[in-house]
């Protein structure tokens, strides 16, 4: 639940910082979450501290979370009015007719689709870290538009977060691609035969 809610806060932070962003999906994954989005500015790893700062500001509000179930038609209209084309696509392609789960941060205009359970308020989010940026095709299809993706993780306490980040750092050091470069094991020839 912590990862789900933190992904929603990331989406809200992106909306605050970049009002023209179009949100796609923000599922949880093992030990974290990601959020895909379309934005005319390329987000880099250097942008993550600013985004984290905005997320902390949102979390500090302690806003309560409200989950509402609405019909397919109402859900499509809601996201059309917000110009959220990816959300509309998800809704329109769904065979589901009713009970679309929507997530609201009270005292804000932010709303998103969300299927998972939620903590009751933002004050329950623990320490988090945005970890990397990447690209991803909409619906995993290279014929579709390339979106941007931000990965993150959230933990119950600072010690658990620190342990996880240390584990990631150690795994990165052992990555065969990095080791190959460091040990000069791979060579590319520029000579064409």
In which residue ranges do the predicted regions lie?
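Auxiliary tRNA-acceptor-end handling modules of aminoacyl-tRNA synthetases
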Residues: 13, 22-28, 34-191
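Active/ligand-binding-proximal structured segments within catalytic/core domains
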Residues: 1-17
């Amino acid at each position: 639940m912590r990862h789900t809610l933190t992904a929603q806060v990331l989406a809200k932070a992106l909306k605050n910082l970049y009002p023209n962003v179009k949100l796609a999906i923000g599922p949880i994954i093992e030990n974290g979450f990601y959020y895909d989005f379309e934005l005319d500015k390329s987000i880099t790893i250097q942008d993550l501290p600013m985004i984290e700062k905005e997320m902390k500001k949102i979390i500090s509000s302690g806003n309560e979370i409200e989950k509402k179930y609405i019909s397919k038609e109402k859900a499509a209209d809601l996201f059309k009015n917000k110009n959220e084309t990816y959300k509309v696509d998800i809704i329109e392609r769904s065979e589901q007719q009713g009970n679309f789960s929507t997530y609201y941060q009270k005292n804000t205009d932010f709303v998103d689709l969300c299927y998972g359970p939620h903590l009751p308020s933002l004050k329950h989010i623990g320490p988090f870290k945005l970890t990397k940026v990447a690209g991803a095709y909409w619906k995993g299809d290279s014929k579709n538009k390339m979106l941007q993706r931000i990965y993150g993780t959230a933990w119950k306490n600072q010690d658990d977060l620190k342990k996880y980040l240390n584990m990631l750092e150690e795994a990165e050091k052992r990555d065969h691609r990095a080791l190959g470069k460091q040990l000069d094991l791979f060579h590319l020839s520029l000579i064409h035969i």
